UniProtKB/Swiss-Prot annotation:
Residues with Phosphothreonine modification: 131
PANTHER family in alphabetical order: RAS ASSOCIATION DOMAIN-CONTAINING PROTEIN 8, RAS-ASSOCIATING DOMAIN CONTAINING PROTEIN
Gene3D superfamilies: Phosphatidylinositol 3-kinase Catalytic Subunit, Chain A, domain 1
Protein name: Ras association domain-containing protein 8
Listed Polar residues bias regions: 382-399
InterPro entries the UniProt entry points to: N-RASSF, RA_dom, RASSF8/10_RA, RASSF8_RA, Ubiquitin-like_domsf
Species the sequence originates in: Mus musculus
Length: 419
């Protein structure tokens, strides 16, 4: 894999990084690329947050922990100070790589080391800066060619070197180069093997990562959209809160005015009640005078009615006395009528006996005739307008009595006399 690291504002790419690659190895590769010595620290930055990586930490593992935000994380190589001994050495004139070369691979030892071999990782305390002394080293120094270096130093220091020593040095270098070529061939074969083995998985991983990047972009867009919406809603909420405060202030003012109005209303109601009571007192006085006048008038009318009732009582007593006298006279007349009726019947009977010379049987008169005659007598004395009308001295006899007075005989005798 490739790891992007920012060095002095320039982005550099470190190739061949795996999950077991440590920060120390990445820093060594970058220090060799820029050709500078000193104390270096690898920093993991996300937005405004920075974290110093320890030398034994794995940058790939640390980036994977960020998940969908891994693309926003930056790795920065920062020089924190000079080396322990800034001395010019024979290697200080080593070739400094050009600034245009931005790709630097890890040392071959880091590639050839087995993934399972973690015993050689240094156990250093976290957040410890890395210190490198000396200039940039070559491949022979990386492979630990101490003998060749010492031999070359002897050759350079000894100006009287012989041709045999030079040939010996050439043969030694040729052997080393052949060994390196063989090692490179084996490494290339291994690389081809792993490329063939993981080409499909790498393509799938690339596709998956591209899809993930797209999803991350969509999520970022959605997040930006919702952040904008949140800001809009917050502004609206702030405006609504301001409006609410204004409304509350207005409500408070209205409540104060309402209290003043209620006090005025209570005062006016008290005045109206007092005025109403005054009017009611005046009206009660006027009504009392009117009632007194009406009472006097009613008393006068009651006196008149009392006098009239006395007169009526006296009249009623006189009428009752007259009625008693008339009733007594009527009873006397009825008794006289009964006596006359009996005498008349006897006279008629004697006349009938004398005319016919026969013996007859006298039947008693029917009671209905006597009751009818009494009813006729009672109806002749009505009362009109509360005054008694006394009957006159002359009184007509019933029609049946007039018939009996005539001595004429008839075929039908109403008195019930049969031969």
């Amino acid at each position: 894999m490739e790891l992007k690291v920012w060095v002095d504002g320039v982005q550099r790419i470190v190739c061949g990084v795996t999950e077991v690659t440590t920060c120390q190895e990445v820093v060594i590769a970058l220090a060799q690329a820029i050709g500078r010595t000193g104390r270096y620290t690898l920093i993991e930055k996300w937005r405004d947050t920075e974290r110093h990586l320890a030398p034994h930490e794995n940058p790939i593992v640390s980036l994977n922990k960020w998940g969908q935000y891994a693309s926003d994380v930056q790795l920065i190589l920062r020089r924190t100070g000079p080396s322990l001994s800034e001395r010019p050495t024979s290697d200080s004139v080593a070739r400094i790589p050009e600034r245009t070369l931005y790709r630097q691979s890890l040392p071959p030892l880091a590639k050839l080391r087995p993934q399972a071999d973690k015993s050689i990782r240094r156990r250093e305390p976290k957040r410890k800066s890395l210190t490198f002394t000396g200039g940039a080293k070559g491949l022979t120094d990386i492979f630990g060619k101490g003998k060749e270096t010492e031999f070359r130093q002897k050759v350079l220091s000894n100006c009287r070197a012989t041709a045999e020593e030079l040939k010996r040095l050439i043969r030694l270098q040729t052997g080393k180069l052949q060994a390196i070529e063989k090692q490179l061939e084996s490494s290339e074969a291994e690389i081809r093997f792993w490329e063939q083995k993981y080409s499909c998985s790498l393509e799938e991983e690339i596709v998956r990562l591209e899809q993930r990047i797209k999803r991350n972009d969509v999520e970022i867009e959605e997040e930006e959209f919702w952040e904008n919406e949140l800001q809009i809603e917050q502004e609206n909420e702030k405006q609504l809160q301001d409006q609410l405060e204004e409304i509350r202030q207005k409500v408070t003012d209205c409540e104060g005015r309402l209290k003043d109005y209620l006090a005025q209303i209570h005062t006016m109601e008290s005045g109206l009640q007092a005025e109403k009571l005054h009017r009611e007192v005046q009206e009660a006085q006027v009504n009392e005078e009117e009632v007194k006048g009406k009472i006097e008038k009613v008393k006068g009318e009651m006196d008149l009615q009392g006098q009239q009732s006395l007169r009526l009582e006296n009249g009623i007593r006189a009428v009752e006395r007259s009625l008693g006298q008339a009733t007594k006279r009527l009873q006397d007349k009825e008794q006289e009528l009964e006596q006359l009726t009996k005498e008349l019947r006897q006279v008629n009977l004697q006349q009938f006996i004398q005319q016919t010379g026969t013996k007859v049987t006298v039947l008693p008169a029917e009671p209905t005739e006597i009751e009818a005659s009494q009813a006729d007598i009672e109806t002749e004395a009505p009362f009109q307008s509360g005054s008694l009308k006394r009957p006159g001295s002359s009184r007509q006899l019933p029609s049946n009595l007039r018939i009996l007075q005539n001595p004429v005989s008839s075929g039908f005798n109403p008195e019930g006399i049969y031969v």
